[in-house]
From Swiss-Prot:
Lipid positions (GPI-like-anchor amidated serine): 433
GO biological process, one term: cellular response to starvation
General remark: Overexpression rather impaired the progression of differentiation. Antisense RNA-mediated dia1 inactivation was found to enhance the initial step of cell differentiation.
Name listed for the protein in its UniProt record: Differentiation-associated protein 1
Biological function: Plays a role in differentiation.
Organism of derivation: Dictyostelium discoideum
Subcellular location: Cell membrane
Membrane-topology descriptor: Lipid-anchor; GPI-anchor
Amino acid sequence: MKFKLFLLVFFVFLLPYLSQSCENTFSCPTLNQTCTGQCSAGLVCNQTLSSCQEYEKCDSSLPLAEDTCSQDGYICVSNVCLPFIGTQYPSSQCKQNSNCLMSLCAGNICMVMPGSQCQTNSQCSPDQFCSTTFIGTTSTSPSTMTLPMTMTLPMTMTLPITMTMGSSSVCTNRLQLNSQCSTSDSCQTGLACINSVCSPIFSGAENATCFPGAIEPTKAACDVGLSCLNGANGYSCKSYVENQSCDPSDEYPVCNSDYQSCKCNSKGKGSCQSYYKLTQECKDSSNKLVLCAKSKNSIPSYKDYVTQINCQSQLCNYSRDCIDPKAKVSTCFNDLFLMCPSDYQEPEIGSSSSSSSSSSSSGSSSNSTSSSTSSTSSTSSESSESSNGSNSNSVSSESSSPSSSSVESSSNSKSNHTSSESSSSDDDLGNPSSSSILSVSKLIILLISIILYCF
């Protein structure tokens, strides 16, 4: 009888625990399906209806104040209305105060608040960062904090000490090349703080000191094959292991690279997966995107619509060369669909991630919800086009390619797209079928356990 009880406990509790694997049943919702953030390319997650709906069409050629977007907080970009609520950087386009991070829209441009006060870098213009200065004063006059100090050596005295602490955060100009730095945020676009000096991105050699948190290749301090890792002497550029094992169920899964996160792989195991292809091609494309963005006073990021408008060619090359195939699945192809509609095409069903990704890479984002929500749009191009001559005109003509026809054609084919996304999702981000098999096997084990217990 005891042996039967042991078998029952083993099969019902221990064996399923030992055989369990991580699960990832991610798929891209289609039209009218429930959504929480992402939808299939060509659709937007309507927060009011909590379902995937088609983008509202509009005319990007119209002045911002005259666009036809019916919902508050929406702006016309690439001929569709996108939700830009409280996400716009200073100098970016806006229609009302709620469009701007600093809640100040004047003349259809997001403005910096008086005094240039800030809380984050995104509240400053692209050539500035939010610098915080801590202020401390001491006096004998009454104030906010009084510390009575008593010392017996052998005499006793009581000394009132008044301490007043505060901080001031203001937008400060970023540091130029070869300037002394203490954080990478303080360096100009295209530079990173390496060995305490503002240096070009991707220039950090092995063991060079660096600062972590470079979430995009356009901010990478370390050269190809290296990542900013913590060691005995602090953070420095070190080689890192691709696809190391990890446990997605951990509260803080450990991956030894800023560009990696712990995800389920096709075998139901946890592995550190990167959203970027940190290769020499990516390094070259990142530098070209940075140069273009700097010339247009925009931010070199695939989530920034200033970049999409001003540097579409460089942005799409960056997307193809730097974004890993896995990212296109987790973002439902929306970044590529909106940023590079001329490059967007339906993935082939059953194709491997390596063969289909070269023509349809997309943006990441592991901690992003909807790419459009965190995107930004700017009119800085209008002031810079006159100084950039024909190059500006050519880029401007490229940015007009996101026509409503491309939006409609991609929307019409979203059903085929979704089935292929599910297939890609199985291969790249986890195997839902394996989790289903696991559930069935657990049920069979439970039945066997009951039979053994009865007989």
